[in-house]
């Protein structure tokens, strides 16, 4: 499959992940405030080679198979610095995920990144439905879903790095997304 394009927003560059990003991911990812609401499959404590293993063994092979699309998040004002990651996944009930280094949170950057990849999901990949699971206590992620017109469709329990929490499933259809643009 064709390599994912670099995406641009007002303040961000979303560049497809590559093996060379491992060092920066290893520096910014393994922080409790980043990982606590992620799926329990994320190892914690995060191993010293966790980012390299993740890129080499999981992310890059799924990109090559056309099953997932992963981008590093970078500021246009500092394009050499990776500050987070946003991904699209071709999985049932799990189509978008992200993390952002703590010092960059609360500035609307993830809203920009999510908007760009959601547009890619609906317009380029021609998908009709986007579903996003999350730990219910992750209020910032919930607010992003609410602001972008997603609907809460299901609640159950899930295992996360920080433990067992109520889990929410949010969705938006392509038609709903287009009406809100």
Language-model features: locations:
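Conserved GNAT-fold acetyl-CoA-binding loop/helix
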Residues: 35-57, 71
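Acyl-donor (CoA/ACP) binding surface of acyl/acetyltransferases
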Residues: 1-37, 70-181
